[in-house]
C-alpha cells in the first residue's frame, strides 16, 4: 500500500526533520513534575529506550523553566517546552529547548507572541502552534457556538497567517479535540488550506485501552489520507505506551518499519500451542 503524503514545508526540531519527505516521527510527553529533575530524566531515558524521537515537558512555572538546562543536558533527543498562559516562560524556555509550544487561545495579546517569535528566532528553533478545543479564543466560540472543527481550523489558520505576515514560517501546527470525528474534520480543514507541517493527536484520548483505540482510529485515518508529519498518542498511562502505540499505528500503515511485525492467530479451540506466549 502506498500513501501519498500531503506536501508540507519541512522544519527541524533539533536533529529531527518534520514535514516534507521526512518520515512521520513519534513523540511523547513526560507525566512527571518537571521540577523533579531526577524523576523527569529517568522517564526521558525510558522514552528514549523505547524509541521516542521527540520529548515534551510541561513548563507551568519559573521553577520548571529553571531546571530545563539540567534536563536538556541529560537527553539525546530533542526537547520541547509546553507553555500555557505565561509567555515569559516561553521566553526562558526558548534559551534552552529545541521547540516551544504555545496555545493561541491562552497565550494572550499579540505583542506577547511577537516577543516569543523574537526569542525562538534568536536560536533558530521552531514554534508549535497548539490549538485545543478546550481553550479556544472567545470570539470563535461566540461565532460558532461551540469548539467546532471549523472553529479549531480558523484559530490555527489565523495564528499561522499572523505569524507568516511578520515573516515567521518556522512552525508546525496541531488542532486537538477529544472527539475523534471533530479532530479528523479540523485537521482535514486545515490541511487543505495550509502547507504547514502537522503534529497530529487526539487530546484526552483516555486510558491505555480506550486511548489507544481512539488514537488508532483518528490518527490512522488521517495518516491514510496523507495528513500528519509527527504524532503523539495521548494516553492516561505510562508515556512509554504512547510510543509503542504510535509506532504500531505507523507500522500498520507501512509508514515506518521498526521491530518485528507479529502475525498471530487469534486462537480458538483448534490451537495446540501457546500462541499468546509465542507472539
Question: Model regions: which residues?
Answer:
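Active-site mouth loops of central-metabolism enzymes
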Residues: 13, 20-39, 58-60, 77-85, ...
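Structural preference for beta-strand elements that scaffold enzyme active sites
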Residues: 8-10, 23-27, 54-56, 76-82, ...
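Glycine-rich, proline-tolerant flexible connector loops at the mouths of alpha/beta enzymes
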Residues: 29-37, 48-75, 104-108, 171-180
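Glycine-rich phosphate-binding active-site loops on the catalytic face of alpha/beta enzymes
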Residues: 51-53, 96-112, 202, 225-239
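Hydrophobic or amphipathic alpha-helical targeting/insertion segments
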Residues: 77, 87-128
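Catalytic alpha/beta core domains of metabolic enzymes, predominantly
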Residues: 132-135, 140-279
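Alpha-helix-loop-beta-strand connector modules within alpha/beta enzyme cores
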Residues: 61-83, 115-127, 187-198
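N-terminal amphipathic alpha-helix/helix-capping segment at the start of soluble metabolic enzymes
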Residues: 1-28, 121, 278
Amino acid at each position: 500500500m502506498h500513501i501519498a503524503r500531503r506536501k508540507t514545508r519541512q522544519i527541524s526540531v533539533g536533529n529531527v526533520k518534520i514535514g516534507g519527505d521526512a518520515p512521520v516521527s513519534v513523540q511523547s510527553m513526560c507525566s512527571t513534575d518537571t521540577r523533579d529533575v531526577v524523576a523527569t530524566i529517568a522517564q526521558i531515558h525510558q522514552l528514549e529506550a523505547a524509541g521516542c524521537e521527540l520529548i515534551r515537558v510541561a513548563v507551568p512555572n519559573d521553577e520548571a523553566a529553571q531546571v530545563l538546562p539540567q534536563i536538556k543536558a541529560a537527553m539525546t533527543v530533542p526537547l520541547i517546552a509546553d507553555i500555557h498562559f505565561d509567555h515569559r516562560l516561553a521566553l526562558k524556555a526558548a534559551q534552552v529547548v529545541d521547540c516551544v509550544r504555545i496555545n493561541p487561545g491562552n497565550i494572550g495579546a499579540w505583542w506577547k507572541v511577537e516577543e516569543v517569535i523574537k526569542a525562538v528566532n534568536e536560536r533558530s528553533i521552531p514554534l508549535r502552534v497548539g490549538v485545543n478545543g478546550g481553550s479556544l479564543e472567545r470570539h470563535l466560540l461566540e461565532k460558532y457556538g461551540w469548539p467546532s472543527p471549523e472553529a479549531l481550523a480558523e484559530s490555527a489558520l489565523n495564528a499561522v497567517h499572523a505569524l507568516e505576515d511578520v515573516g515567521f514560517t518556522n512552525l508546525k501546527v496541531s488542532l486537538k479535540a477529544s472527539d475523534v470525528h471533530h479532530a479528523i474534520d479540523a485537521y482535514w480543514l486545515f490541511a487543505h488550506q495550509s502547507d504547514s507541517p502537522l503534529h497530529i493527536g487526539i487530546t484526552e484520548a483516555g486510558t491505555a485501552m480506550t486511548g489507544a483505540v481512539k488514537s488508532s482510529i483518528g490518527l490512522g485515518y488521517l495518516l491514510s489520507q496523507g495528513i500528519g508529519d509527527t504524532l503523539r498518542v495521548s494516553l492516561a498511562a505510562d508515556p512509554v505506551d504512547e510510543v509503542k502505540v504510535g509506532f504500531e499505528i505507523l507500522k500498520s500503515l507501512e509508514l515506518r518499519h521498526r521491530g518485528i511485525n507479529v502475525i498471530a492467530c487469534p486462537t480458538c479451540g483448534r490451537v495446540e500451542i501457546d500462541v499468546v506466549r509465542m507472539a
